[in-house]
Amino acid sequence: MGTRRVTPGCAAGLLVLLLRCFGLAEPSEFSGDDSFTIVNENTGKCIQPLSDWIVAQDCSETRSMLWKWVSQHRLFHLESQKCLGLDMTKAADNLRMFRCDSSVLLWWKCEHHSLYSAAHYRLDLKDGYATASTNSSAVWKKGGSKENLCDQPYREIYTRDGNSYGRPCEFPFLVGETWHHDCIRDENHSGPWCATTLNYEYDQKWGICLKPESGCEGNWEKNEQIGSCYQFNNQEVLSWKEAYVSCQNQGADLLSIHSAAELAYITGKEDIARIVWIGLNQLYSARGWEWSDFKPLKFLNWDPGTPSAPMIGGSSCARMDTETGLWRSVSCEAQQPYVCKKPLNNTVELPDVWTYSDTHCDVGWLPQNGFCYLLANESGPWDAAHLKCKAFGGDLISIHSLADVEVVVTKLHSGDVKEEIWTGLRNVNSPTLFQWSDGTEVTLTYWNENEPSVPYNKTPNCVSYLGKLGQWKVQSCEKKLRYVCKKKGEITNDTRSDKLCPPDEGWKRHGETCYKIYENEVPFGTNCNLTITSRFEQEFLNDMMKKYDKSFQKYFWTGLRDADARGEYSWAATGGLKQAMTFSNWNFLQPASPGGCVAMSTGKTLGRWEVKSCRSFRALSICKKMSGPQEPEEATPKPDEPCPEGWHTFPSNLSCYKVFHIERTVRRRTWEEAERFCQALGAHLPSFSHMNEVKEFLHLLQDQFSVQRWLWIGLNKRSPDLQGSWQWSDRTPVSTVIMHREFQQDYDVRDCAAIKVLDNAWLRTWYYYDERKFGYLKPFSCDAKLDWVCQIPKGSTLQVPDWYNPERTGIHGPPVIIDGSEYWFVEEPRLNYEEAVLYCASNHSFLATITTFTKLKAIRGKMENLSGEEQKWWVKANANPIDHYFLRTRPLWHRFSMLLDEECLQMSAKMWHLDLNKRADCNDKLPFVCEKYNVSSLEKYSPDSAAKVQCTGKWIPFQNKCFLKVKSEPVTFSQASSTCHTYGGTLPSVLSKSEQDFIISLLPEMETSLWIGLRWTAYDRISKWTDGRNLTYSNFHPLLVGRRLSIAAYFIDEESHYHCALMLNLRKSPLTGTWNFTSCSERHSLSLCQKYSENEDGRPWETNSETVKYLNNLYKIISKPLTWHGALKECLNENMRLVSITDPYQQAFLSVQATLRNTSFWIGLSSQDDELNFGWSDGTYLHFSNWAVDNEKLDDCVILDTDGFWKTADCDENQPGAICYYPGNETSKEVRPLNSAKCPSPAQSTPWVPFQNSCYNFMITKNRHRTITQKEVHSLCQKLHSKAQILSIRNEEENNFVVEQLLYFNYIASWVMLGVTYENNSLMWFDKTALSYTHWRAGRPAVKNHKFLAGLSTDGFWDIQSFNVIDETLHFYQHSILACKIEMVDYKEERNSTLPEFIPYEDGVYNVIQKRVTWYQALSMCSQSGRHLASVHNPKEQLFLEDIVNRDGFPLWVGLSSHDGSESSFEWSDGSAFDYIPWKSQGSPGNCVILDPKGTWKHENCLSVKDGAICYKPTKFKELASHAHSSKCPLVKRNGSQWVQYGDHCYSAEQALHTFAEAKKLCQELDHSATVVTIADENENKFVSRLMRENYNITMRVWLGLSQHSLDQSWSWLDGLDVTFVKWENKSKNGDGKCSILIASNETWKKVECSRGYARVVCKVPLSPDYRGIAVLFAVLSVLALISGLIWFLVQRNHFRWTGLSSVRYEHGANEDEVMLPSFHD
């Protein structure tokens, strides 16, 4: 590990987490609001939207190619006025341009030069089109530069005036139909203005833009006497950091006050706010108070007692009471008005303080650049020291620059860093004004922590500095200290050259070192490798480089590089050794990447460090030569030095660590409180210089926790001086790049970092977290309250404040502390089990139980250290061993004892897994472990008071809570919880119905399910929220009652073993806001975080205002006694209406109004028919209700009560108030369809929903699970209404409507139950009507009894569940909603006709194959009964077939198909002409056709399985011509077709379809002389065509043996004959293929591709001699040969005895073509 040199210059340390903190931390020179082109580096092309695509084209600066960063990380395209987004619901083509208020993912962020969004998608370029890809390596840059797209990110523009309390602009914002990406001007506003929400028309939130202005016009007031301009933002309430950024963005700063006159001017303003922020802060680690504009803090007007003595809970920002002019430190997160300030004249000439001058001084005095210094050895009070210096011809030291500070800390001191030395700074005034005793102007202040602390109303006050640190402190002038005198010396060289430096021109001296600039731009390391060791050296180099400020920005190489590309930067190796960093000065967002080399910038970021390419980047050089001995490195701790008792370390580390967690401290703390806590112990929050330190540190922490923790570390960017860069609180320089995608986000004003301890301790057995470590470090809001870790150098002495309770080693050694348990290990005395139990009890503890793997690991380790791995120890059995609920999924070695009935347990470090699973002898004498449940506290009392939590920034207050809307991609519960922690909050807890209503009112535009803070195991009782509050209110979805959920748990994912709660956002469903639960490892939206506030603030809800706006409606709250009719009249007088409540969001918002006012209000609901039906007074249809459960509806008018429910009340009684409203577009009077039914009033708190001529009630009552049969459901429907039936669905529109209703419950239920029954061998509805419309998922159900359930799923398909499997049936029912339906039209007569088996029509009889078949199977089944698949030839026949299909209810095959390979040439399978087209356009692929119940003719693949087919049998048959069969034709093989003679050839027509290749092979198989048919003349063409028509099957296409040669493009027959006859069809229709077919229907030929399509095959063979005679002759000869052989054998056997043969005679049969062989005669 490298050394950590603590120098006064180490204050500028930065760690870059690559946090894109847009707008709140970057330097003010980054405008970030300019438009730019997006260039792909590989192609040089720019992207722009074109139609529905984003394309790459040649770059230009036209509006069509310009983009801008706008709010919420969106990329806005200027011309299209849309944002680049990702539609995650699509697997492909998901990158599109969307409206900027779309719900799709619109955010984009940068990583190096790539652009990424959710789910690891990155912007890519393929084939000229921009796409989103997860493996993209595309590099994107801003046009005309080498900048990353995020190098100048979007900056917030804050506002004033208006009605947004100073909130920043939201870009783009919508006014009318135009999206504006910048502030706009119009006659209605006094200056350029913007909306602070997306939709100005909707929200009407706006403010005047605060942008840079030249001079003091507009929003500024000028004071020439003081020389400054001021901006008083009296109505704008922001946090200190937001106010600072608002001023910075205008080229100004927060108010600084430097004189009593300026203070009087500010306090004299009559219209100024009472409390305002000023720029005073102490946010820079280990430094004191300073102005944010870096002017000297010499004038003070602290409130008495502020700042107090150093406190742990001190606040680091200051505000001013403008009535008294007094200043007080407060929490930086408070929301307050603010004042900005900028100078009238900004041309300040800075003195030259860094140029070296040879100086002559008296003996004993230190010469330095024209002055002489003397550090006195004697001590004395300030006045005596002042007189002594005067006597020496000088004065007490005055310090005017960092060059002077450098003299103090590097030249005058070499001893104790805490030595205090008098300076010449003193105050004798009230209010305080510090002045130098030598009369020079105060141009610099360098205060120590919590300084300047000036006693109230006591003067004089004198200032000392602290030895080696050089920082200043206010002291009593009577205190005796050493002092430094200063006087002018004699400059001995006017030329300002120095003999120690080389004689070459350009060398400059600083201390004992010489420097020179080389102005040629070269790669890294060409000239030299510059090292920078302190802030003073950096300031000197800045002085050398400042002449380049006005030229084009230049860079200067340093010697800093990451040679190993591991993200660890060090100075270039000298002598083979890397030199560790002792100082860092990174620029904003740096170091940006590993593996680079570091250069210093010029311009506005003069001297800041940036990572550049070592090879390709060119920069100037500064070389450095030492003219004296190199300063020795400061001593660092040794790895073997000890740690304080109770502190921990790891090998080779130089620090000790201690965790302070809630179980051992009074409370969790903010970052500043935690850092001050550590400082009080002589420590700091942790810092890291190397990657392995992070890894080891995490390992150390994980051994102490069994649950996830976030812990503060020392990383922060709080100070304005850091300009958005990061530093360690202990001044350790930042040398490490931590690169992870999670870090590359802007976290607004999250200026402090925390580290997460992984909770999956057992998982680490297999997974080492090294590759995942970066996910455990995140920026947080600094006011978040977390546990923390302190770090102290090894060998240091721990400071012990009186409130601290340090670890003490007891008689049994130090304890082991895990979470909230404290374990003591008792080696002696050794006792039996019962004695060990008693011993622990006598010491206020218990025999230890082990319930987590973290505890097991720690206890095993301690046992092994104390007594070796074999020794057994007593522990106690536990009824709930380690995570017992998933032990069944673990191997043996991860199990704990199952012998829970046996109390005595012992374990050893080595064999614990076996020890805990076997019986032990309780009389054994063993050591044992005791456990204290109340772990020893590390604090005797709280030394500080907790800072008050307020609802700041975008936090929305409600009662004692603050809520924050968050946008994120879907995350697990723990990820959601962690993100809320980074904001300083938790996931929401819902403690009352009023909180539930408030949260519902925030749900519009959020996702359909969002995490809330409930987490439990399946074996736990849900009792607490994750914020620790008790579960006193619940709102689980009623469908969860009585339902058994099956939630998968995975061994490898511990989070999946927990259940977590979701809040459902079901849009306009009355169940919006109810809760569901699921596995915690699932991914859902994080939309809300909460934190508790100590101030109940209802400002955004304007509870005292009569008029409130919500969503698109304007409401007026009338707070006076009124009758219902009086309320109606009162609203009309206001040109408004008595409110109608049409959705759950309005209901929740108005419920909150009633709750906050504790008042019931009249609403516009009343009944005109004695409480039978209720309706809204403005005619809005009643489809949403929120009746109280116990409301009996005894009166005709309705109130919204204080509990948020609707209740009836007497219309003539006075109620405390009423709510009027003026509806916006969304809630204006609904236009009900003419055919929409008028439905009854809501039943059982659920409304009847109208659609077409029916009303529907979707039952969600808690007792609905008690019904399961359809008869029981029908009975339940009858109770709701006498005409109600269980749900039936008549058409597609109704099906879609029911699906839309079901989607409101889609996270709870999967089906709506359908009233389908089975009677008379068919399915029908419960009301005995036919299923005229169906949408079964798996096609025609194969049910033959009534033992099933049917349901409509969320995707619109119908599912059927047989009773065969009980678990599946129960699951189906428990995930179904019951629905009742009232049909206002009697469908029974219309829907009652069933489909007969045979249907005669004109010249045919039709029937339906009611079976799932392919097209070819349907064709075969029709053919087997002498039928054909149906064909259509006119509209009348089409309507007839459509009626059959509609009555059957399923899509059916017809006889239409295409086999040409292009799905274009369709033919009827019965051979009839395709003379009528039954569809308007071909909308689907496929080569066969079905007809569906909607009358749609669809193309489908012939091999796909459908629900049946239509066959027909003609009543009139055609007579077929006969063909002669000749014996001169080949014999028929197997089941082949008969050969037919025509002329001197034979022809065989195959029934099957074949490709051309198959056709050639087939003919060869039939006869070796056969070929695919060739045609010589017109007559043969007619014969073949007629043959195919008479033997028709599927198609008229016939392969011809005619093909085209590739070489000469000539055509030839396969049998080698010349082509003497052709009959090509019309050239315009003919193809360009190299094969040919005959179309038998019109007897023409067509060119086709040889490899595409199918056709029939006709084989042709020449007519030969009598084939049958030849066969007989061959057979006879064969027999004779056999006989001859037999005779020869017999002759040989019988010694050549001879027997004669009779003659053989051939005879002709009756048929001359036949050859007969009747018999053999002896």
Curated annotation (Swiss-Prot):
<feature type="disulfide bond">
    <location>
        <begin position="1488"/>
        <end position="1502"/>
    </location>
</feature>
<keyword id="KW-1015">Disulfide bond</keyword>
<dbReference type="GO" id="GO:0030246">
    <property type="term" value="F:carbohydrate binding"/>
</dbReference>
<keyword id="KW-0472">Membrane</keyword>
<keyword id="KW-0812">Transmembrane</keyword>
<dbReference type="InterPro" id="IPR016187">
    <property type="entry name" value="CTDL_fold"/>
</dbReference>
<dbReference type="InterPro" id="IPR036943">
    <property type="entry name" value="FN_type2_sf"/>
</dbReference>
<feature type="disulfide bond">
    <location>
        <begin position="678"/>
        <end position="790"/>
    </location>
</feature>
<feature type="glycosylation site" description="N-linked (GlcNAc...) asparagine">
    <location>
        <position position="865"/>
    </location>
</feature>
<dbReference type="InterPro" id="IPR000562">
    <property type="entry name" value="FN_type2_dom"/>
</dbReference>
<keyword id="KW-1133">Transmembrane helix</keyword>
<feature type="modified residue" description="Phosphotyrosine">
    <location>
        <position position="933"/>
    </location>
</feature>
<keyword id="KW-0325">Glycoprotein</keyword>
<dbReference type="InterPro" id="IPR013806">
    <property type="entry name" value="Kringle-like"/>
</dbReference>
<feature type="topological domain" description="Cytoplasmic">
    <location>
        <begin position="1692"/>
        <end position="1722"/>
    </location>
</feature>
<feature type="glycosylation site" description="N-linked (GlcNAc...) asparagine">
    <location>
        <position position="934"/>
    </location>
</feature>
<keyword id="KW-0597">Phosphoprotein</keyword>
<comment type="function">
    <text>Acts as an endocytic receptor to direct captured antigens from the extracellular space to a specialized antigen-processing compartment. Causes reduced proliferation of B lymphocytes.</text>
</comment>
<dbReference type="Pfam" id="PF00040">
    <property type="entry name" value="fn2"/>
</dbReference>
<feature type="disulfide bond">
    <location>
        <begin position="317"/>
        <end position="332"/>
    </location>
</feature>
<dbReference type="Pfam" id="PF00059">
    <property type="entry name" value="Lectin_C"/>
</dbReference>
<keyword id="KW-0732">Signal</keyword>
<dbReference type="InterPro" id="IPR001304">
    <property type="entry name" value="C-type_lectin-like"/>
</dbReference>
<feature type="disulfide bond">
    <location>
        <begin position="597"/>
        <end position="614"/>
    </location>
</feature>
<keyword id="KW-0430">Lectin</keyword>
<feature type="glycosylation site" description="N-linked (GlcNAc...) asparagine">
    <location>
        <position position="377"/>
    </location>
</feature>
<feature type="disulfide bond">
    <location>
        <begin position="1197"/>
        <end position="1211"/>
    </location>
</feature>
<dbReference type="InterPro" id="IPR000772">
    <property type="entry name" value="Ricin_B_lectin"/>
</dbReference>
<feature type="modified residue" description="Phosphoserine">
    <location>
        <position position="1703"/>
    </location>
</feature>
<feature type="glycosylation site" description="N-linked (GlcNAc...) asparagine">
    <location>
        <position position="1320"/>
    </location>
</feature>
<feature type="disulfide bond">
    <location>
        <begin position="462"/>
        <end position="477"/>
    </location>
</feature>
<keyword id="KW-0254">Endocytosis</keyword>
<dbReference type="GO" id="GO:0006897">
    <property type="term" value="P:endocytosis"/>
</dbReference>
<feature type="glycosylation site" description="N-linked (GlcNAc...) asparagine">
    <location>
        <position position="529"/>
    </location>
</feature>
<feature type="glycosylation site" description="N-linked (GlcNAc...) asparagine">
    <location>
        <position position="1076"/>
    </location>
</feature>
<feature type="domain" description="Fibronectin type-II">
    <location>
        <begin position="164"/>
        <end position="211"/>
    </location>
</feature>
<feature type="domain" description="C-type lectin 5">
    <location>
        <begin position="958"/>
        <end position="1091"/>
    </location>
</feature>
<keyword id="KW-0677">Repeat</keyword>
<feature type="glycosylation site" description="N-linked (GlcNAc...) asparagine">
    <location>
        <position position="1626"/>
    </location>
</feature>
<feature type="domain" description="C-type lectin 1">
    <location>
        <begin position="225"/>
        <end position="341"/>
    </location>
</feature>
<feature type="domain" description="C-type lectin 6">
    <location>
        <begin position="1110"/>
        <end position="1222"/>
    </location>
</feature>
<feature type="disulfide bond">
    <location>
        <begin position="389"/>
        <end position="485"/>
    </location>
</feature>
